[in-house]
């Protein structure tokens, strides 16, 4: 991730320098859609050089026409876009929950900010219960046209381990 951080910082500096010294009134080309395409080419090249970056990256933001953009790129340079995305353990457990609320682009567009944050909080609770090594604290980032709002000290609410008392051994449980 440090390589990507340095590389993207250099890219942003180059972009700002070129934009500052050009006479074109054109807006910056470094938006979410272009960044995603750039990352997919970078990851694909590294894969072909037999030196892959072992990351799954989600890119969120806005494209050139100011439409919301959400896509992923993996270590092979494979790209994917969807109304909701997750990586790692969340791709297996949280993604079905998010699809319940945002199965299509239209469903996702109808979600309010509060509803979307509540869906993410529900997903984080499920992930916390299913991973013994997880913490009950997490961060949430909300991307809007005005910028990124980062809330770093979120904590799971209404935790209840009452269901654990009924679990005996492994396998199918009968009551």
Predicted regions, residues:
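Short, flexible loop/turn motifs enriched in small residues
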Residues: 52-54, 65-66
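Conserved short S/T/G-enriched processing/targeting/catalytic segments and their helical context
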Residues: 1-53, 80, 85-119, 128, ...
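Short glycine- and Lys/Arg-enriched binding-loop motifs that mark or flank ligand-binding interfaces
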Residues: 57, 73, 84-86
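Hydrophobic beta-strand positions in blades of beta-propellers and related beta-sheet-rich domains
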Residues: 68-72, 140, 148
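Acidic-glycine-rich active-site phosphate/pyrophosphate-binding loop
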Residues: 59-76
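Short beta-strand scaffold segments in enzyme catalytic cores
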Residues: 55-61, 137-143, 149-151
